[in-house]
Design a protein with these regions (language model features):
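N-terminal acidic leader/helix
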Residues: 1-32
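Helix N-cap motif at beta-to-alpha junctions
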Residues: 9-13, 42-49
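Short amphipathic alpha-helices in soluble, non-transmembrane regions
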Residues: 19-22, 50-59
Length: 60
């Protein structure tokens, strides 16, 4: 498993956090501010692609 660092808006995070639990992907919250949230996920490349594709899907 690899670590992937993500900077997300609260909109993205609100939608993604339930999916991370559903997909059994571990994450840690590194930093939060008024604009967004930094997280690190521990995932295989296949699961990481699933996460990135889901974030893209939020904006379609």
């Amino acid at each position: 498993m690899l670590d992937y660092e993500l900077y997300l808006t609260y909109y993205e995070w609100g939608n993604l956090k339930l999916k991370l639990k559903e997909w059994n992907i571990e994450y840690t919250i590194d930093n939060q501010n008024t604009e967004g949230i930094d997280i690190t996920i521990k995932a295989t490349p296949v699961k990481a692609k699933k996460v990135f594709d889901y974030i893209k899907w939020l904006y379609i």
